[in-house]
């Protein structure tokens, strides 16, 4: 099965040469997702919970556009700028993964825009869309 580009309706053009997601062999690969509005500006500056919610809603949109759901997520790569935000980010993260949790890692690092506090990339196994 060839690779399929996944771009949810209303998605802005990324600021670099990539797409929001790709689907190949029943697996959705979601690009690193930042708390950006449609003009690629950081939203909810200073609020790690709101930024995390925005990021996960964006990821959810990509996965649902591909025919899956957040329950299909098997792995998340999480990048945060400050460990003091870790608990707040986890609180919102748990809302999106209430059942069995996906595997993940979380590292502290700098992000592409200074006001961004969190970035998440995801992998979801959705099987063959019907």
UniProtKB/Swiss-Prot annotation:
Enzyme superclass (EC): hydrolase
GO cellular component, one term: cytosol
Catalysed transformations (reactions): (Z)-3-aminoacrylate + H2O + H(+) = 3-oxopropanoate + NH4(+)
Enzyme Commission numbers on file: 3.5.-.-
InterPro entries: RidA_CS, RutC, RutC-like_sf, YjgF/YER057c/UK114
SUPFAM superfamilies for this protein: YjgF-like
Keyword annotations of the record: Hydrolase
Methyltransferase is among the record's keywords: no
Any Pfam family the entry gives: Ribonuc_L-PSP
Single GO biological process annotation from the record: nitrogen utilization
GO MF terms, alphabetically ordered: deaminase activity
Similarity field: Belongs to the RutC family.
Reported function: Involved in pyrimidine catabolism. Catalyzes the deamination of 3-aminoacrylate to malonic semialdehyde, a reaction that can also occur spontaneously. RutC may facilitate the reaction and modulate the metabolic fitness, rather than catalyzing essential functions.
Name of the protein described by the UniProt record: 3-aminoacrylate deaminase RutC
Annotated source species: Klebsiella variicola (strain At-22)
Encoding gene per record: rutC
């Amino acid at each position: 099965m060839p690779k399929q580009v996944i771009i949810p309706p209303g998605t802005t053009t990324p600021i670099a040469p990539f797409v929001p997601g790709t689907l190949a062999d029943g697996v959705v690969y979601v690009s690193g997702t930042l708390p950006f509005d449609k003009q690629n500006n950081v939203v909810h500056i200073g609020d790690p919970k709101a930024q995390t919610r925005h990021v996960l809603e964006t990821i959810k949109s990509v996965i649902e556009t591909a025919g899956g759901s957040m329950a299909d997520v098997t792995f998340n790569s999480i990048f945060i700028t400050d460990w003091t935000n870790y608990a707040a980010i986890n609180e919102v993260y748990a809302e999106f993964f209430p059942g069995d949790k996906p595997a993940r890692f979380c590292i502290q690092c700098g992000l592409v825009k200074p006001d961004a506090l969190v970035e998440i990339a995801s992998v979801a196994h959705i099987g063959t869309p019907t």
